Amino acid sequence: MLDMTFEQFNSLNFKLYDGNPVIKNPLNSFVIADPSVIEAEYSPDGKLHLFAHGFFGVYHYISDDGFNFHKFAKVAVNAMRPNINYIEGKYYLFYEKTRPVIFNFLSMFGGKWESDIYCIESTDLVNWTEEYPVITHTRDYEDFGKGHAISNPFLTKFGDKYRLYYSCGQTFIEDCGFGEPTHISFAESDNVSRGYISLEKPIISPDESSLHLNLCSGCLKVYHLSDCYIGLQNGIYKRDGKSHSGIVLLKSDDGINFEYIRDFLSPQMCGDNKWMAQYVYACCLSKQGNKLRLYFNARNTSSNVTGRESIGIYEADI
């Protein structure tokens, strides 16, 4: 839980870090995306650990200061959209498990896409267990075309229950040439690693009348404040004939029904740098000393040829 009220959070003055992007796409991938962070106070070595995905799996980065990162290891293959958690002395890394890259590529041309939520565990962020399934296909709303997609895991605790938010389904975004998640739902369990039961219907779906998710829902990250829950959602929307994505701030009393509050971080030019000009995607909120930092990934353009995704920071004093 973040020890602040909604009013306090909403009044914070977030600013983009001047040194963005802090992690650029690697040479073997056009993207580095979906950052998830373990703060130094919860890590075994007193450093900040960040997990993100490229074309060929989930990668582990380490930083002494939260700004300068070096790649440490690849921790999962055929995997994307990680979510790292520290619970009672153990690290749980959830992610979207896909089929091999060639099958993902063929899904763009009518092939079958299949993905589910898997997890690996560690006590030191170095040695990991074998992966195991956590959420698999059980609901019709997870379907699309010939397959199904379950993605963007994000774990929270609600009383005695573990709640794993996830995105599902896929909507093809024409100008990008790839799919983005259609719906957002969650599953609950008494056990952090197994026994999750998904809702019978999603909690967020695309809305043609919305300015923020008229194409599809993207993903949702939920944080517990002292008086409510907030959601940071990056829906996918069409505006001026092009697709875009931006992060919006949502508010909820129960973590199920969310109210739109305001745009939180929108695509924009950063001087002459176009790195976040068209899309701002998934994020992770991290408290570091007297700073609240939002790690996020963004994309310069919808073009499959020149499009690149990198990771940046949006931060505020607290």
PLM regions and their residue ranges:
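Active-site lining segments of carbohydrate-active enzymes
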Residues: P153
